[in-house]
Amino acid sequence: MQDALTHGMLREYLPILVLLAMAIGLGLILIAAAAIIAYRNPDPEKVSAYECGFNAFDDARMKFDVRFYLVSILFIIFDLEVAFLFPWAVAFGDMSMTAFWSMMVFLSVLTVGFAYEWKKGALEWA
């Protein structure tokens, strides 16, 4: 009985596997066709950097302020918080008190970290 159930469940994934194989196959065929058919005539003008029709004045690599990285890391942290919070909120009715207090500890650690960043002035640009 268990073998038949497992076999039937795996059979339901067959259309997804076929679609995945077709998508990968079509992607590889299109990439190969473009590599074979494409006209290649590189010259210095084609491979040079394009900047609004003018030659590039300077190197494109510039220094960025560290605050950009700080804001991006904070965004990732709080984005992951939301990613953890949504499934927890959906299943909230079926959870025990341990799950509730675990999430409260998680949220309080993030709140304390955010308050620390705010207090240190890491989010101010002036």
From Swiss-Prot:
Keyword terms: Cell inner membrane, Cell membrane, Membrane, NAD, Quinone, Translocase, Transmembrane, Transmembrane helix, Transport, Ubiquinone
GO terms, molecular function: NADH dehydrogenase (ubiquinone) activity; NADH:ubiquinone reductase (non-electrogenic) activity; quinone binding
Function of the protein: NDH-1 shuttles electrons from NADH, via FMN and iron-sulfur (Fe-S) centers, to quinones in the respiratory chain. The immediate electron acceptor for the enzyme in this species is believed to be ubiquinone. Couples the redox reaction to proton translocation (for every two electrons transferred, four hydrogen ions are translocated across the cytoplasmic membrane), and thus conserves the redox energy in a proton gradient.
GN (gene name): nuoA
Compartments, record wording: Cell inner membrane
Residue intervals passing through the bilayer: 16-36, 73-93, 95-115
Organism encoding this protein: Rhodobacter capsulatus
Catalytic EC class: translocase
Enzyme Commission number(s) of this protein: 7.1.1.-
Gene Ontology, cellular component aspect: NADH dehydrogenase complex; plasma membrane
Membrane topology, record value: Multi-pass membrane protein
InterPro entries reported in the protein's UniProt record: NAD(P)H_OxRDtase_bac/plastid, NADH_UbQ/plastoQ_OxRdtase_su3, NDAH_ubi_oxred_su3_sf
Subunit structure: NDH-1 is composed of 14 different subunits. Subunits NuoA, H, J, K, L, M, N constitute the membrane sector of the complex.
One Pfam family matching this protein: Oxidored_q4
Domain of life: Bacteria
Entry similarity comment: Belongs to the complex I subunit 3 family.
Catalytic activity of the protein: a quinone + NADH + 5 H(+)(in) = a quinol + NAD(+) + 4 H(+)(out)
Protein name in the entry: NADH-quinone oxidoreductase subunit A
